[in-house]
Amino acid sequence: IRLTTKEKWLEEGRPEGTIPRTADMFRWPEGGGVLMLDYDPPPDGIPLNREDLVSALRRAVPGLCDAAMLWWPSASSFIINTETGQQVRGLRGQRLYILVANASDIPRAGKAFTEALWAAGSAYFAVSTSGSLLSRTIFDGSVWQTNRLDFAAGAACRAPLRQERGEPVLVPGA
């Protein structure tokens, strides 16, 4: 199946094998799934390391202390210049993946995580370019929408740049 914009999909007469990336075209399945947590530090901020990120999550949501999770740097992390050996970009964005028994519960869980992160002090307001206050937590709440994609494949780099994210790390539960 190919993804496209709704506008293009309608213009092309709703072609077979193509769907728009809109919420009404996707759903969370009943049964097992994967909850993805997307962490991007503020542009001018120092990113949390893996241990501090997991600790912040578990402090806010103690029920996750027993949950194993998979950690992996985002496509924005660990870019090096192979000619100089210089790290052009270190650890920035990160993902945590948690197996869930009922994926259709992900939106509700995401809302509960957001409330818990605010209560734990792991949230803030950002100011938009128009001056509006934007509610933010350490995890991007928009990823709990059905039509959000996880761009997990890594960065497409041209020589002499290369991404060296390593392998995903299994973070055990307590």
Residue ranges and their predicted role:
Residues I1-Q94, I98-A120:
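Signature for HUH/AEP ssDNA processing cores
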Residues L117-A174:
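Catalytic "initiation/cleavage/transfer" segments centered on a nucleophilic residue
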